[in-house]
Amino acid sequence: MPLLDSFKVDHTKMQAPAVRIAKTMTTPKGDLITVFDLRFCVPNKEIMSPKGIHTLEHLFAGFMRAHLNSDEVEIIDISPMGCRTGFYMSLIGAPSERRVADAWLAAMHDILNVQDQSKIPELNIYQCGTYTEHSLSDAHATAQHVITRGIGINKNEELLLDESLLTE
């Protein structure tokens, strides 16, 4: 099986919270797609709770769209990483890492303003596969963690994993 791009960066060097351009590609029609690594937690040292990351998933996507979508940028998807240290965001366009970081920070403030679990979007048996598995307090703790630390930028050239360490 081919080695995925996300496994070609040294996770021991990643800063968090931080934005990284994980991948760019151009569609056959010429649209630029950018995939961002939005790293909330330091890999192998910190982790988001399952209920907290699930709640963030419901809140973060809408708030990021409100702060980042424009005539030049349209978010396709924001999905949690299986390792629970961040989210991947795929979008049409090529906003700068700083613009993404600013939108992310604004979204974290928005999350802190959600004061009741009943205000979490799509939190019901019809629209959520595990609608009882949420924690607004865990989502608040993660949002506060990001705000307190600030959001940096991870550069691929600084994280490139030495080829001797690559295993498939």
Swiss-Prot record:
SUPFAM superfamilies: LuxS/MPP-like metallohydrolase. InterPro entries: LuxS_sf, Metalloenz_LuxS/M16, S-ribosylhomocysteinase. Keywords: Autoinducer synthesis, Iron, Lyase, Metal-binding, Quorum sensing. GO terms for biological process: quorum sensing. The lineage of its organism: Bacteria, Pseudomonadati, Pseudomonadota, Gammaproteobacteria, Pasteurellales. This is S-ribosylhomocysteine lyase. It catalyses: S-(5-deoxy-D-ribos-5-yl)-L-homocysteine = (S)-4,5-dihydroxypentane-2,3-dione + L-homocysteine. Homodimer. Binds 1 Fe cation per subunit. Belongs to the LuxS family. Involved in the synthesis of autoinducer 2 (AI-2) which is secreted by bacteria and is used to communicate both the cell density and the metabolic potential of the environment. The regulation of gene expression in response to changes in cell density is called quorum sensing. Catalyzes the transformation of S-ribosylhomocysteine (RHC) to homocysteine (HC) and 4,5-dihydroxy-2,3-pentadione (DPD). Its cofactor is Fe cation. Fe cation binds at residues 54, 58, 128. Its EC number is 4.4.1.21. The gene is luxS. Pfam families: LuxS. GO terms for molecular function: iron ion binding; S-ribosylhomocysteine lyase activity. It comes from Actinobacillus succinogenes (strain ATCC 55618 / DSM 22257 / CCUG 43843 / 130Z).
